[in-house]
Structures are given as structure tokens and as C-alpha cells.
UniProtKB/Swiss-Prot annotation:
Principal subcellular localization: cytoplasm
Subcellular localization: Cytoplasm
UniProt function note: Specifically methylates the N7 position of guanine in position 527 of 16S rRNA.
GO MF annotation list: rRNA (guanine-N7-)-methyltransferase activity
Native species: Granulibacter bethesdensis (strain ATCC BAA-1260 / CGDNIH1)
Name of the protein this chain belongs to: Ribosomal RNA small subunit methyltransferase G
InterPro entries attached to this UniProt entry: rRNA_ssu_MeTfrase_G, SAM-dependent_MTases_sf
Length: 213
């Protein structure tokens, strides 16, 4: 069904990131490999990932994004991914789960890539080519972002885009704990911090019960 030259994404590797008992089909591996091929090709002309990372897209970006699967698995309903860029993590999660996903990306060229990749991988995705502040999207139960903005800013987006009892999953770098300390002066929230399994200095923040101080 999907014709790609490079090896398929190893489904056994994906399974290590999933809750016990979850299955990953060969078709999912094929779709992720197709996405990887498209991301590599488009990056030659559109700045989707760092040029230094082109040879490491699978490990540094795709598998990194798949780390959210165990946190996402118990959360029902649509997902909104903001600042989607090259589809990390939003499109990767849409491919892996089949979940209804909304990708928000203001850059028109990146949005064009997202539409093409979503079409090619037959993903349940809607691309919103607009600034986060200006997008008219119904609130969703899950919000994701990866290396997008300071936590204070992300929480402001979450307050508007998350539905009642919604959960934010933010992928942060080595400043995660500092950002949490700073955000605590302006926000009430419940936080679960998990170390990244692909980047030693990175973290994943699971945040809910968000409100302003």
C-alpha cells in the first residue's frame, strides 16, 4: 500500500513505548516510514527540522514524539497540537493512534507539508494554518506541544484550548524545572514530570487542573 525505500520503523521499538497489551500494526510502521521519507525530502527546502538532524530524524524526532503514547493512551477524544512545524509530535501521534488530531501551524509552507503528509499517510488530521491566538478551534481533551514556547505561554494557550478536565502534554528541554518554578507564581496546576527516554536532559510534563493564581 505504501511504497518507501528506507527500512520500516521498527514496530518492536514502538511497542516498548506503549502500555502493556497495546498492539502496533505493520501498516502503522509503513505509515511512519512514509512520514519519515516525506519529512526528510521536504526539509531540503523547508526548515522542518534542523539540517544537523536530518540523518537522525527517526531517533531524535519520531521516536521522541512516540514517547507520549503511554500518557496519551488513557485520554479519550480529539487532540490539538500547537506549533506543529514538521508534525512533531502531533502528526506522529495521529499516525500511531488514528486519533482525530488538529495541527496548528502559522507558517504556510510548513502547513502545506502537514497537509501533504496527512494525506499520504491517510491520517485523521485537520491542519489549521493560523496563529495559535487567532485559530478558531473547539477546545479538546488533549493539548500537545514540543519545544515551542516558555511554560507560562503554553499554559495560557492551554487555558483556552483545553476542554473541561483536559490534559496538556508538553515536551520540554533542560529548563523544565526552572520553567515550572517560574510558572508557579502565575498558575495553579497539577504536574507530573517524566524524564525523556531519548534525550537525557529533556522532560515530558503532564499538566492538568490549570487555572490562574
Amino acid at each position: 500500500m505504501f511504497h518507501v525505500k528506507q527500512p520500516l520503523i521498527n514496530c518492536q521499538i514502538i511497542r516498548t513505548l506503549l502500555p502493556a497489551g497495546s498492539g502496533v500494526s505493520r501498516e502503522t510502521g509503513e505509515k511512519l516510514a512514509l512520514y519519515e521519507s516525506l519529512l526528510t525530502r521536504w526539509t531540503r527546502t523547508v526548515n522542518l527540522v534542523s539540517r544537523n538532524d536530518v540523518e537522525h530524524i527517526r531517533d531524535r524526532h519520531i521516536l521522541d514524539s512516540l514517547q507520549l503514547l503511554p500518557l496519551l493512551e488513557p485520554l479519550p477524544g480529539p487532540l490539538i497540537d500547537i506549533g506543529s512545524g514538521g508534525g512533531l509530535p502531533g502528526l506522529v501521534l495521529a499516525i500511531a493512534t488514528g486519533r482525530e488530531t488538529h495541527l496548528v501551524e502559522a507558517d504556510q509552507r510548513k502547513a502545506a507539508f502537514l497537509r501533504e503528509a496527512a494525506r499520504a499517510t491517510e491520517s485523521n488530521v485537520t491542519v489549521h494554518a493560523c496563529r495559535i491566538e487567532q485559530c478558531n478551534i473547539a477546545p479538546a481533551p488533549v493539548l500537545t506541544a514540543r519545544a515551542l514556547a516558555p511554560l507560562n505561554v503554553l499554559l495560557g494557550y492551554a487555558l483556552r484550548l483545553l476542554s473541561k478536565n483536559g490534559v496538556a502534554l508538553f515536551m520540554k528541554g533542560k529548563t523544565a524545572e526552572q520553567e515550572l518554578t517560574e510558572a508557579a507564581t502565575e498558575w495553579h496546576m497539577r504536574v507530573q514530570l517524566s524524564p525523556s527516554r531519548t534525550h537525557p536532559e529533556a522532560s515530558i510534563l503532564r499538566i492538568d487542573e490549570i487555572s490562574r493564581v
